[in-house]
Regions:
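Binuclear metal-dependent phosphoesterase catalytic core
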Residues: 6-9, 24-26, 31-34, 117, ...
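Cap/insert and terminal regions of metallo-dependent hydrolase folds
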Residues: 79, 84-89, 195-224
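N-terminal active-site segment of His-dependent metallophosphoesterases
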Residues: 2-97, 106-110, 162, 166, ...
Length: 289
């Protein structure tokens, strides 16, 4: 399901189950649900933009079960910007699950811990190498990092500063792999800020491609049965692409969504099946073993 009739359709759709071709009555079967996931990135909340998305957040909560925020949610990484966001999104956070990853802008002012605390205090789940589950769907999230794509991905060669840069990209990839490995759900969703493939940054100047994402992030996505990937960062990129194994990737940068779907709500909505919920291993549980 995409944008067309999004307000008219119901959120949850029980389906009839069969075993060996024999229908099972709903009272005797595990009822599967379709979960609607909305995603957007690069809101860049700052002084003067408060109130801009309040109506949109309300509309999203009317038609989606879960909202993903894929980084650069605020502009300069200031706590006051986070408070403006929470003022607009607080009612939505009471109605539906909101899951987020940070982007590069959240780090600009060196107050990222305070920003995270404000967002978490307002009911937003922040993922940074962790896994979580909501309504039977699994989510793995990291910020990601630059580094380039394909055969031109930056290698750890030469100056120590280059090696540290590549190490950061590798670490983000390993964090994503660890998070995906913890999930035991029918559907898995990966949310990032930086792009895992080149296809969804097409449209940006070629000179900045290495700073828009890194194909090292694609490796763990291909290794696990991921239903979809969402990212942002490339405001002038391409909305949709696929990994080398065919997994759909959506660039949900706000500016790109507004250009791709003019007059529509500022989000991309997909539907995924929800299986019986099984708890994901948390980072704390892993550390305690």
């Amino acid at each position: 399901m995409y944008h067309g009739d999004w307000l008219q359709r119901r959120k949850v759709h029980p389906s009839r189950r069969e075993i060996h071709g024999i229908p099972i009555a709903q009272s005797e079967a595990v009822i599967e649900r379709t979960i609607r996931i909305a995603a957007v990135a690069d809101l860049h909340y700052r002084t003067g933009t408060d109130g801009r998305f309040r109506t949109a957040f309300t509309e999203i909560s009317d038609c989606a079960d879960i909202l993903l925020l894929c980084g650069d949610i605020i502009d300069y990484g200031l706590p006051d910007e986070a408070r403006l966001l929470m003022k607009d999104i607080s009612e939505t956070a009471k109605r539906i699950t909101i899951i987020a990853v940070l982007g590069n802008h959240e780090y600009e002012s060196g107050k990222v811990d305070e920003v995270i605390a404000i967002m978490k205090g307002g009911g937003i789940t922040i993922l940074d190498g962790e896994a979580c589950e909501a309504q039977g769907v699994g989510f793995a999230g990291v910020k990601g990092f630059p580094g380039g794509f394909g055969a031109r991905v930056l290698a750890p060669w030469g100056e120590p500063s280059i090696k540290r840069f590549v190490h950061e990209a590798v670490e983000e990839s390993l964090k994503l792999e660890s998070a995906l490995a913890r999930l035991r759900t029918t559907s898995r969703i990966a949310l990032l800020h930086y792009a895992p493939i080149a296809a969804t940054v097409m449209g940006e100047p070629l000179e900045i491609f290495p700073f828009l994402g890194c194909s090292r992030l694609e490796e763990p996505i291909n290794r696990y049965p991921v239903a979809a990937v969402f990212h942002g960062h490339a405001h002038n990129g391409t909305h949709e692409g696929k990994t080398s194994s065919g997994i759909p990737v959506y660039n949900v940068a706000l500016k790109l969504l507004e250009k791709t779907f003019p007059g529509k709500p500022p989000c991309r909505i997909i539907e995924v099946p929800s299986g019986p919920e099984q708890r994901a291993e948390t980072a704390q549980a892993q550390a305690g073993r």
